[in-house]
Amino acid sequence: SEVVPFNTTLDEIIEKKPAGIILSGGPSSVNAEDAHLVDKNIFEIGIPILGICYGMQLTAHLLGGTVKKGTKGEYGKANFEITKSNSVLSGISRNSTVWMSHFDEVETVPEGFEISGKSDVVAAMANEKKNIFTLQFHPEVSHTEEGAKMIENFVFNVCKAEKNWKLTNYIDKTVSEIREKVGNDKVILGLSGGVDSSVAAVLIHKAIGDQL
């Protein structure tokens, strides 16, 4: 997997040949003047998409639905009821606990989309024909009871990705990228002793040795 910014061009995305795209959550409003908007043509290139939280609102906004400021924020655990199952919600209990963290909400869904779940608001919508699925809640956190299964459904059943990821492959790729970027230069690293900086230190030292 690779994390890229919202303003990555469509050509750059296509060049990467992703099996799928996840539009992540965030604190912004799609209705703000400085909203982080992606190229709407991303929905027309045939790559499966999963929109999470802000990613759902973004999908609705760009494709002709409406997103409004909520009367009250929804933060914390919420009951999620599936109203129409789809490939991402396959095998998920009709009622389950999910984790919400949003203020804006989808008021009307775009043409071609169906509401697939609700809480106090529209909690999921999808255009199954185009392999576009969205969730207002966060499936990636442990508080969402069956969130891991939803992500698994998207990655393996919708995107048809293979279960071939290995930590050693990531280490080798990262070490190679560090060597290429650093070249003959030296690196100064501020080490806090936490997990992130410690892992970074090990990888950088493995890549460039005494240049660190």
Regions found by a protein language model. Name each.
Residues S1-L23, S29-E33, L37-I45, Q57, ...:
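RNA-binding accessory domains that recognize and position tRNA/RNA substrates
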